[in-house]
Amino acid sequence: HLVDRIEYANGRVDKKAKVQKIRRVLKSETVKIMKKVLEHVVLEGSGKKAQIKGYGVAGKTGTAEKLSKEGGYAKRHHVVSFCGFTPIKDPQFTILVVLDNPAKYTFGGTAATPVFKQVAEGLLSMYGVPPDQPENLKTDKKKEKI
């Protein structure tokens, strides 16, 4: 499940769902590989602006040109995104940021990742999630082969 409850600022809980594990959809080894690949996007690729000091972050950026009414693609109209999770060792939050026609930046790595970072930092702080990475963001992980 993706949502187990909805909590409002006034403390009201709107929905509670039972967690029911049905089946494993990916092999453990596949999950490990995908985590490394998605972490690499944040450490060395287009998702660098999603880095959070002290926390491992993994995710994928996205950029798409919108269709033009005249046919083909509209050159200056984009949908950009970043979907990521943190902390890597024991993920607590999965966040999807989608921006329709961002005003200034037209790539997921420049427009959506800072929004992800701000939301994730707020959630990690609000829920008291302890850091899972050393304070230094540039770890030896970037040298690992994927």
Name the predicted role of every residue range.
Residues H1-I22, E29, L38-G128:
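Active-site beta-strand/loop architecture of penicillin-binding DD-peptidases
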Residues P130-I146:
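Short, highly charged C-terminal tails/helix-capping segments
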